[in-house]
Amino acid sequence: MFNGRPFPVDAFPKIIRNAIYEVEQHTQAPQGLIAASALGVISLACQNRIDVCRLNNLRGPVSLFLMTLAESGERKSTVDKLLMKPLYQLEEDLFEKYTHDLTAWRNDEAIFNIEKKALMSKLKSDIRRNKDHLATNERLKELLTTNPKAPVRFKFLFNDATPAAIKAHLCGHWRSVGIMSDEAGIIFNGYTLNELPFINKMWDGSIFTVERKNEPEKLIRDARITLSLMVQPNVFKGYIDRKGDMAKGIGFFARCLMCQPASTQGNRKISNPIFSNEHLPVFHQRLMEIVNESIIKINENNRICLRFSAEAERHWIEFYNQVESEMRMIGLLYDFKDYASKMAENMARLAALLHYFSGDGGDISVTAVKAAVEIVAWYIEEYIRLFSKKEEFSLDVSEADELYCWIKDYCTQKFSSCIKKNIILQFGPNKFRNRDKANELIRILISQNKIFISSWGKTKIINITHCVF
């Protein structure tokens, strides 16, 4: 069961779009998979540099939660390595530096503790003997100001960690990480997602209190987490069977941009052995510019707050209102209100990421917002397809098929692959001219991947999937 509508790669800014096409040329992996991987690494790079501000005072993270379902052999690991290559190298280099600095710090700390112990012993002796201890006192004070500071552990990626380990790291000096895996079975079957309320709080950008026995209370403040998981469908189904109700009930899935792109296996033939190699380095350069800037400015703790331009904000509000309208009884998102409630925020985050990563200055542009709308709309269709409860539609399936046949016949007569939704209400069979009935059957056809919905201004367009004339 796959979505016939291609991922809207052309909506991306040039620097991202070209990199995605180049990775596709090298791997022939599904575009949706490559795009999700690119969005994950962009989110990880940018989340420590920027926040997004909506409606003047609603400030929040830009971090994305992405979940991509793909069978074994879809070249998930290859895609991940191509897009993440410089970040993997940087993390390796920084870890090597950290281990060296940690050894030096432990040596300095040992010397410091010896000097501290000696001065404290002398101070106690001076006090006991009623001797002038002012000089010793000053020497001790001066020494205490030179207490060696532990090196910062710059860790970007977690792929098999307990919630306790992630919390411990986020209590430290570097509080921007990604839970990322190209084979996320170990995450879905392990401990990493055992505390989803904590993961949700990190998506929200909330303060989180960590309490441990025999330890002082700690706060996780201003932390950022990107989630980018590629998982095989059968592994995800097992997770759904075990914990799906809880994950959906507390809003974890609602925060995620989820998809299952159509497989390219069986169609990955080599037509041209000469590959482009010019675009990924540009993508990598921008990626590392942002990451290195975050490292350099670690002590400033001051993210840039990106705001929408006036025109961009109008488009964001229009998207918000449209999503809200579709949550009504007759709307396409009526059965998915939990997911719909997070879409405007996810769109704002995505717009901020596209704007900042492309190097555009100033406020978030209307171009970035329009691109974000197109991408988020694709993810909405994917979520509906993945989570539609088909068993509830059994009584209406025959009518849905009947409507589908009528739509196909109409399109064939018009030599088209699409039809305005209002055409059904005006000229369709009488029993389908009721708006509520038509909307219900359209939802069924979307869930069956027979049609998908697009918009032309305020007009809803019904498109037939895989339609050939």
Swiss-Prot record:
Query: What is the protein name for this chain?
Result: Protein YfjI
GO cellular component: a single term: cytosol
Q: Which InterPro entries match?
A: DUF3987
Domain of life the protein comes from: Bacteria
Note, other: Part of the CP4-57 prophage.
